[in-house]
Amino acid sequence: MAVMRRTESAAASIFTQALFKKFKTYAPPARTIGVMATDTAFAADLTAQLRAQVQQALAAGTRLRLRGGGSKDFYGETLNGALLDMRGHHGVVSYEPSELVVTVRAGTPLTELEALLASQGQCLAFEPPHFGPGATVGGMVASGLSGPARASVGALRDFILGVKIINGRGEALTFGGQVMKNVAGYDVSRLMAGSLGTLGVLLEVSLKVLPVAPAEATLWLAGVGQQQALDLLNRWGGQALPLNASCWVHDSAEQPPRDALFVRLRGAVAAVEAACPRLTADAVALGAQVQRMDEPQAGADWTACREQTLPFFKAPPSALQALHTDLGLWRLSVPQTTPALALPAVVSSPLIEWHGGLRWVWAPASAAALLRNAAQKAGGHATLFRASPSRGEADKAGGVFTPLTPVQQGIQRELQKQFDPAGIFATGRQGAA
């Protein structure tokens, strides 16, 4: 995902000049706050070695491709450059549950971080997808992806308080901090979210964490059509309801197949219990059948949604497979209030998340322009998230991401020039700026 989709700035020169006045040389902290995630014997700070590798690459003119567990290798334009494996640089630097902040090295397995937080009744509220057992914290930040709760709690970038990186000159730098009220360097830290390793080596990240909600309920609304679901979600979004996540899909696993909307509520016990009958009444008025799911099954289904192991994500519809060999999974990000998109017959029925803001479809590479036009008309953009396994790079030739505007291209070039003047991280993962 292009860096420019992660920033609110509109003026390249003023923006980048202001950013780099805030640079500081990074010295790894010697202190530990609160609870350590792992025994220090299993933690490793490879800052010095990583700096040396970057400096060697700079001297040799070698481009570097940063990699953790490789769980998101499918994402982005290309995988060029000499591999710089980040898994050895791992461990939790500090964790203070009472302050709701954790600082962790990039190579730390995401499962380990989540287990530590769970032991203290806390979590990463944006529900980052793993897409594989080897997922690391660095890959989580670099991909910039958020899970089902994103529309209600915010995106990954909203939870980044500070980062420590190695830039293209081999310098270790720090931005932001470990407190939520920190201002200096805040936007620079967030630029790392979704940068796909093209701005520098992420050493550490400080993240805001949240307590696990005391109550949760998932409602299964069967027989709710796509536009009906969008209308309901828009109506509920304007009310004081603990709406946390939603997923609408044409459920082909049911016999006969039918439309279904899944809604997750999270919050105080009283709020969740009061909301369930209200949502049920609204859905029943439309002729839907409503069932409150068992918590273990609901939890497994939301995990499957996050990790894209639901039937929808496993394979394109058989009717489309019979006609096309270049079917890929497309990600359409649009305003939540966007009505059902009018898409051609070569595009599958969508799976809709984020209360209408995220729409997944299967479509052939030849439909790229149609999808991008539909998303842009709605005020959003379309991304080829997973290319056809049989065609891979061939289907990415038309571009994975929606092309940037000239202004956005200018800002991105300036950012890359400041972070990485020699272009050793310019692997083409985000396409040409």
Regions found by a protein language model. Give the residues of each.
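C-terminal substrate-binding/cap subdomain adjacent to the FAD-binding core in PCMH-type
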Residues: 142, 161-320
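N-terminal flexible segment immediately upstream of the FAD-binding catalytic core
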Residues: 17, 22-24, 28-102, 129, ...
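Low-acidity, Ser/Thr- and Arg-rich intrinsically disordered low-complexity segments
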Residues: 5-9, 13
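N-terminal glycine-rich flavin-associated loop
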Residues: 37-66, 86-133, 141, 145-178, ...
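Short, conserved charged micro-motifs
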Residues: 111-113, 227-231, 270-277, 338-346, ...
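Conserved glycine-rich FAD pyrophosphate-binding loop
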Residues: 77-79, 87, 132, 288-433
